[in-house]
Amino acid sequence: MAPTDGAAPDGVDFYDRPVLAVAPALLGATVWHGPVAVRITEVEAYGGLDDPASHAYRGPTPRAAVMFGPPGRAYVYLSYGVHWCLNVVCGPVGSASAVLLRSGEVVAGRDLVAGRFPRLVEADLARGPGRLGRALAVTGALSGTTITGPGPVTVALAGGRGIRPPGPPGISGGRVRRGPRAGIRVATEWPWRFWLAGEATVSGPRPPRRPR
């Protein structure tokens, strides 16, 4: 199913930019696969050959070959033999950069997704990269496919166009937060995780809430 809110998938040029420019611009974007759509609330950037936490750090292995380009493609990998995780390839060909779509809110196909997670509350249906991948029913067969359309997975940016400073289109720059990446063992101090403040779907470590 194509996006139905009037926002079209952005072209390859949007993704042919540095990973730290693309990552926060994906916040608020809507990812479609079939009848299910997820609005992205949390992402992580991975810098390829210069990033020891990246799958591409040691070069173009069979698993990570997709990361080397072209940009605007899905990179889907199996985590711990259990969870399929969805990334978008960005940067010039050969830079091997990608953005992990870490968390989001299910905005279409809720009943279908809830059937996949019968014990979870709505905010948790796509909270975390494993659940997001399962909510969208992605598998390794989608790795390397275009996300700019036409294709099985499409990404429609908030507002439908590329980033306009100070933040993603349709998103107030003041809502975007930045901090260390989660769930990795190296380069843990790099502030390459971005999320939308005030979203219950965000999965990574967050500052404690103020007492009411």
Curated annotation (Swiss-Prot):
Species this chain originates from: Frankia casuarinae (strain DSM 45818 / CECT 9043 / HFP020203 / CcI3)
Superkingdom of source: Bacteria
Name of the protein in its database record: Putative 3-methyladenine DNA glycosylase
Enzyme class, first EC level, given as a word: hydrolase
UniProt key word Manganese: no
Stretches assigned to coiled coil: none
UniProt cross-references to Pfam families, sorted A to Z: Pur_DNA_glyco
Record flagged with keyword Hydrolase: yes
Biological process (GO), any one: base-excision repair
GO function terms (MF aspect): alkylbase DNA N-glycosylase activity; DNA binding
Keyword terms, alphabetized: DNA damage, DNA repair, Hydrolase
Family to which the UniProt record says this protein belongs: Belongs to the DNA glycosylase MPG family.
Enzyme Commission identifier(s): 3.2.2.-
